[in-house]
Structure formats: structure tokens, C-alpha cells
A protein has these predicted regions:
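Class I S-adenosyl-L-methionine
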Residues: 1-105, 109-113, 134
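Short, glycine-/small-residue-rich phosphate/pyrophosphate-handling segment
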Residues: 110-140
């Protein structure tokens, strides 16, 4: 079965990349992500595809069955306001689980990193996201 690994790369700083993420990136035969993310891994010798659009990524993977071990780069953590969720849902729907196994490797989220820098616990933090939204949350 072919492998797709959604890899959380944290803040993009190689010093904060997890060892599991590093190993996954180094073992890929295809690495996919936004250009700015791929540029951080220019030393990797596998093929690359620059995109952050779920439809384009799904199409590319399905049109290139020669790749056996695919890595998708996501900023931060794959489970915290991540594009990994929409990719996983859409790809599973389109591919129907016939050839690919999808797994996730977590990264350091901006929230945990920020709280660590401020030396505050984040277990009682209220989280809202304004990313891509026009709602005036600050004024309410």
C-alpha cells in the first residue's frame, strides 16, 4: 500500500522540527507543500510539487501513481487549524482507501510555541481563529 504522510513542520525553523518529521521528510520520494515550505527542505533529493491547494494536490497524487511514499508539508501541527484535515477528508473521499494509507505526524503548533515563549501554561487558554475570516471578533 502506498503511503501519504501529512507532516507538521512547526514554525518552519529546522531547529523546531520533530525527529519523526525529519525522518519522514528524508524518506519521501515526493514532497508536496507551499513553495515557502519546500524551500526549507531544498537539501532533500526527492521530487517536489509546490501547491497548497487541496484539489491540486489530490489531482497530482492521483495522476502520478509512480510515487510510493509521499510527504505533505503543513505549517504548525497537523491537528490544529491545519489544512491536513481538509486534505485527508477530500483525498479519502476521492480515493476510497484502495491504494493509499494516510498518516499524520504532529508538529509544534504556534499556540504551544507562543505560550512556551511567554512561560504560561495553555491548558486554560480560550482559542479562536480569525484566519481567513472577516468577522470583527475583536470589537465584540
Amino acid at each position: 500500500m502506498k503511503q501519504i504522510t501529512c507532516i507538521g513542520i512547526g514554525l518552519g525553523n529546522p531547529d523546531t522540527l520533530t525527529i519523526a518529521a525529519k525522518h519522514a521528510i528524508e524518506s519521501c520520494d515526493l514532497l508536496i507543500g507551499a513553495s515557502r515550505m519546500l524551500s526549507s527542505f531544498s537539501h532533500v533529493t526527492c521530487s517536489t510539487f509546490a501547491s497548497c491547494k487541496t484539489n491540486e494536490i489530490c489531482d497530482y497524487i492521483l495522476q502520478h501513481p509512480e510515487y510510493q511514499n509521499i510527504g505533505l508539508l503543513f505549517s504548525g501541527d497537523t491537528g490544529f487549524y491545519s489544512g491536513a484535515k481538509s486534505f485527508t477528508n477530500q483525498f479519502k473521499h476521492r480515493e476510497q482507501g484502495q491504494e493509499y494509507e494516510i498518516k499524520h505526524i504532529c508538529g509544534i503548533s504556534s499556540l504551544s510555541y507562543f505560550c512556551a515563549k511567554l512561560q504560561i501554561p495553555w491548558d486554560d487558554v480560550t482559542i479562536i481563529s480569525l484566519h481567513g475570516r472577516e468577522t470583527p471578533w475583536i470589537s465584540t
